[in-house]
């Protein structure tokens, strides 16, 4: 296993560990999801580049665009939550309590 793949796998596991340990604030969970998505994106780009040599470049751009859309949607949800509940705590997100 190359050191490059080891770094990508460690980033992925750091993202999972961050989600498990930082479940209090929504912003930290979103940052950990971004770390997961970026590590998967780098792994997919590396695998496709080794396999197809630039033929699948458009798929990488689509995945990167979708990750940017996911980040903006998560940030807008966090802003809406913090405006209505005055905090970004995950415990205040339970809709059934209202």
From Swiss-Prot:
EC number: 7.1.1.2
Keyword NAD: yes
InterPro entries the UniProt entry points to: NADH_UbQ_OxRdtase_chain4L/K, NUOK/Mnh_C1-like
Catalytic activity, as annotated: a ubiquinone + NADH + 5 H(+)(in) = a ubiquinol + NAD(+) + 4 H(+)(out)
A biological process from GO: ATP synthesis coupled electron transport
Transmembrane segments: 1-21, 24-44, 61-81
Disulphide-bonded residues: none
Enzyme class: translocase
Function: Core subunit of the mitochondrial membrane respiratory chain NADH dehydrogenase (Complex I) that is believed to belong to the minimal assembly required for catalysis. Complex I functions in the transfer of electrons from NADH to the respiratory chain. The immediate electron acceptor for the enzyme is believed to be ubiquinone.
Protein name in UniProt: NADH-ubiquinone oxidoreductase chain 4L
């Amino acid at each position: 296993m190359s050191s490059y793949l080891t770094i990508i796998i460690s980033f992925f596991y750091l993202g999972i560990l961050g989600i498990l340990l930082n479940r209090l604030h929504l912003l930290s969970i979103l940052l950990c999801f971004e770390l997961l998505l970026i590590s998967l994106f780098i792994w997919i780009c590396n695998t496709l580049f080794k396999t197809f040599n630039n033929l699948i470049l458009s798929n990488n751009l689509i995945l990167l665009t979708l990750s940017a859309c996911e980040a903006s949607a998560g940030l807008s949800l966090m802003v809406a939550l913090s405006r209505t509940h005055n905090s970004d705590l995950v415990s205040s997100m339970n809709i059934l309590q209202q």
